[in-house]
């Protein structure tokens, strides 16, 4: 046992199965990982993961890290320029754990206790990798950002929606900026936002 977290959270196992389990179709997690290494890290379409020794991974991935990494918690310049940031993540995201976004927010907050003045994190229940899944995955992020940037109205309670293929809304759920969360009242349909209350974590 190495005490290393391999699969960090419960939830979304069914909807995320194609990212983590073999199937008759090409596993997207495998294709994404191997393709990323071939074309972004090593610039070698013949790169073979089965012969790679991971002891040099930090050195090998340094170049791609310089233009893809988004993990610097020092947002002082961003704040000074009056920047505003909304980060959202699906709780059922298979390839990228939402706990990474939570950890990032906490790191920023350690540097700046006033982080919520310019940075809000929303976690969408049942939503997989950027959209889809059992949960409501549609939020009007653009209007939310416009209200914050142009009218000085920071986002608070938002409504996420799930629609069917005909565009009909089949589920709504309130969202609150982390660490606040919506909790089912215990009565009424779980597909209705009105049946959820705000709870502090």
Question: What name fits each language-model region?
Answer:
Residues 1-201:
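C-terminal His-loop and adjacent cap/lid subdomain of alpha/beta-hydrolase
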């Amino acid at each position: 046992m190495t005490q290393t977290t391999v699969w960090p959270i419960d939830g979304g196992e069914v909807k995320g199965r194609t990212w983590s389990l073999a199937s008759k179709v090409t596993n997207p997690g495998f294709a994404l990982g191997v393709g990323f290494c071939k074309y972004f890290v090593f610039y070698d379409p013949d790169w073979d993961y089965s012969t790679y020794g991971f002891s040099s991974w930090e050195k090998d991935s340094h170049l791609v890290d310089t233009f893809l990494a988004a993990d610097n918690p020092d947002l002082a310049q961003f704040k000074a320029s009056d920047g505003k940031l909304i980060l959202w993540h699906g709780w059922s995201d298979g390839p990228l754990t939402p706990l990474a976004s939570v950890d990032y927010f906490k790191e920023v907050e350690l540097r700046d206790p006033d982080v919520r003045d310019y940075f809000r994190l929303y976690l969408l229940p049942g939503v997989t990798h950027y959209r889809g899944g059992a949960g409501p995955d549609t939020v009007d992020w653009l209007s939310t950002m416009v209200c914050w940037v142009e009218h000085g109205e920071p986002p608070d309670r938002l409504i996420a929606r799930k629609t069917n293929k005909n565009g009909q809304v089949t589920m709504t759920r309130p969202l609150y900026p982390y660490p606040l969360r919506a909790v089912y009242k215990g009565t009424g349909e779980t597909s209705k936002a009105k049946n959820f209350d705000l709870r502090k974590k």
